[in-house]
């Protein structure tokens, strides 16, 4: 109880910082590789099950336009690789393996490949998301990210006067299926890097259709992230994160309690 009160007080003490435009011009392109490892513990029909899921996601990004404190960022996933382990069985996959295209078990993961998604970002928050392929793609990405993906993270757009150690601000983002409340604190500033610690409380409600089965997930928890930005350009260089989510997963009408542990690591490379 005491910990909850302290965390709530920290969020209340923080404030929203007015953002500025990214320092880099429209047309800037970069690649992001994100590795994530999820361990899910669940109990269903009297049986305890542990599922280990590791993913490596390759994405291309482009800063499409900049207007004041608002900018548009487009992205597409070019490759997915990883492994799934459950009940003594392990399966590895790589979207570059041509044989996977005929595997119905991978249909949900592969449908996100090479589909452009456009994000409009204002004051450090995504205010609009659009995809020509519709909401199914966006729902799939939401489920796979477990609330750890923040598309507003790639550019640090604070006023120059705010770039100093201990400066903090908060962002509340309530969207259908995902509600997050994040506290940002600048941990260190050097001539080359700006280190930012992020504490995010997330609540995820999503529905995923996999192999003809409807899977509903209701989870909430906390994610801790460390981001390193280039001090000159304000572009993200790397991110690491750990966290946990708890809740229920509904499969075939049956609720099962789940406990999800998440670790992530991202690296950004200019193109």
Each language-model region and where it sits:
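Bacterial Sec-dependent N-terminal signal peptides
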Residues: 1-25
């Amino acid at each position: 109880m005491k910990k909850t009160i302290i965390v709530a007080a920290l969020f209340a003490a923080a404030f929203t910082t007015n953002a500025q435009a990214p320092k880099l011009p429209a047309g800037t392109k970069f690649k992001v590789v994100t590795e994530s490892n999820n361990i899910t513990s669940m109990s269903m029909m009297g049986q305890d099950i542990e599922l280990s899921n590791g993913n490596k996601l390759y994405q291309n990004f482009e800063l499409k336009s900049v207007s004041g404190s608002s900018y548009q960022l487009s992205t597409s996933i070019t490759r997915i690789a990883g492994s799934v382990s459950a009940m003594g069985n392990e399966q590895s996959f790589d979207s570059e393996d041509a044989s996977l295209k005929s595997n119905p078990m991978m249909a949900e993961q592969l449908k996100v490949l090479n589909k452009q998604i456009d994000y409009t970002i204002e004051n450090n928050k995504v205010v609009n998301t659009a995809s020509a392929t519709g909401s199914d793609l966006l729902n799939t990405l939401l489920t796979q990210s477990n609330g750890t993906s923040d598309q507003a993270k790639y550019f640090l757009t604070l006023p120059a006067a705010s770039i100093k150690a201990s400066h903090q601000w908060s962002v509340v983002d309530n969207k259908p299926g995902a509600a997050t409340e994040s506290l940002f604190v600048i941990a260190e500033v050097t001539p080359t890097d700006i280190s930012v610690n992020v504490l995010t409380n997330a609540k995820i409600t999503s529905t995923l259709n996999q192999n003809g089965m409807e899977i509903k997930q209701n989870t909430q928890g906390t994610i801790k992230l460390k981001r390193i930005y280039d001090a000159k350009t304000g572009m993200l260089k790397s991110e690491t994160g750990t966290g946990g989510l708890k809740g229920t997963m509904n499969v075939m009408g049956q609720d099962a309690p789940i406990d999800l542990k998440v670790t992530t690591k991202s690296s950004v490379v200019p193109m």
